[in-house]
């Protein structure tokens, strides 16, 4: 299995025109140790890093990662809340690589602007001795990456890297490259950690309530938007028990 993953991972790395590819598949792997050894196989195949900290600890390979949408939402579903999240993250991880997730609400109208503002407030610029950048996780990645690059350069952040994730595989990466995307590094999860023959269940964690207060993740991709507040799942059936269920509704 490890050798097969190496072959697939190497294919993904090569199709990304030699840009760094990081393994982000732990949450979708078929068990905790599958995640650990799958990440190891990805590193052997040529991935630049893995989000699996245990793999990095056991095998001495580089671990990498950013932040979750739930982290951003936990500071409040407002533009200022996003800024507070970025500021807290930078202050906590100062002296390390800093990658800010900018698509929790709106990539160009607030996420990127908050990232630039927070970088500058904390003295993060092209003289920062570690890596710094922003991550895109939804929307038209090719278009957004071009626009983000223009705005970053206009603000003097020429060394700020653009990372991209969102169910990527070697084919999507190749397509992004053909479109002229200004992406510096790709994060690949499902396509590395699982196979087409035994794929993953495409569920994700979204924060909907914190300390009794509803929170909501906005997105330019409507499929990624959620209802705020505590919810229950209702199973609807026309002819129970003959017909076990027809649809599940969360509200």
Annotated model-derived regions:
Residues 150-155, 160, 168-251:
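Gly/Ser/Thr/Ala-enriched C-terminal appendages of enzymes
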Residues 98-100, 162, 186:
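Hydrophobic/aromatic residues located in beta-strands of well-ordered beta-sheets
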Residues 165:
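Short hydrophobic "strand-cap" motifs at the C-terminus of beta-strands
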Residues 1-4, 8-158, 168-174, 178-179, ...:
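Buried, small/hydrophobic-residue-enriched core segments of structured protein domains
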